[in-house]
Amino acid sequence: MQHNRISSPASMLADPTRAAIVLALMDGRSRVAKKLALDAGVTPQTASAHLRKLVAANILACEARGRFKHFRIAGAEVAHAVEALSELGAAAGRTLPPAAHELRFARCCYDHLAGRLGVAITERLPLLGSGVLAELGIDLDALESQRRPLSRCCVDWTERRPHIAGSLGAALLRAYKDRCWLLAIEESRKLVVTPRGRAMFVERFGVDEALFAAS
């Protein structure tokens, strides 16, 4: 039935342990079951049972590397759905947990930038010329030839406004990291803006300097 296409994946994420496991993987990296058990605060046996269900539901993908299995988000569409569900929870009036405040300014949303900085850049993009993207080594024609959509709006669960996803969103985040404008934090979705990154986001993208002062 049509409603099963919604209810089945939603029921997978309704369980707090499975939700914690999926959210731990929203930085786009893969992890072993033992680490995900620690992230979710459960035993390895319990985590393994939940991981099997998430893989069977095509929410997570599993890859064997030597003796260990590594788990990751199954794809961009899954990450987009998880972010949308997170935004629905925020819109329902739930208070953000303390850990979420650390992620609010800049974080990975699977393979693109989210948070206040991600939203601010997204709002500035239509005002910028293609030269800014070219300076970052981003080839729009090459991105448009991919099967993945060039851009799409991903509603930010902390800001409740859209940030850019799609192949362009992923290319932008890669460019920021390659130029050390943003630094990833190990085992976290949080991204740190470097002094050079702050200067470049203000100079090249026109992001308000006050945004960084308030972070």
Regions found by a protein language model. Give the residues of each.
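Amphipathic alpha-helical dimerization/coiled-coil segments
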Residues: 1-4, 27, 78-126, 130-131, ...
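N-terminal helix-turn-helix DNA-binding core of bacterial DNA-binding proteins
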Residues: 4-43, 69-71, 108
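Basic, amphipathic "hinge/linker" alpha-helix immediately C-terminal to the N-terminal HTH DNA-binding motif
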Residues: 63-88, 197
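Key DNA-contact positions within bacterial/archaeal DNA-binding proteins
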Residues: 45, 52
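Conserved hydrophobic residue
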Residues: 30-31, 60, 182
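Accessory beta->alpha helical hairpin/"wing" motif in late/C-terminal subdomains of nucleic-acid enzymes
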Residues: 71-74, 127-139, 186-203
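Base-recognition residues in the alpha-helical recognition helix of bacterial helix-turn-helix
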Residues: 23, 48-49
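Beta-hairpin "wing" of winged helix-turn-helix
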Residues: 55-65, 72, 185-186
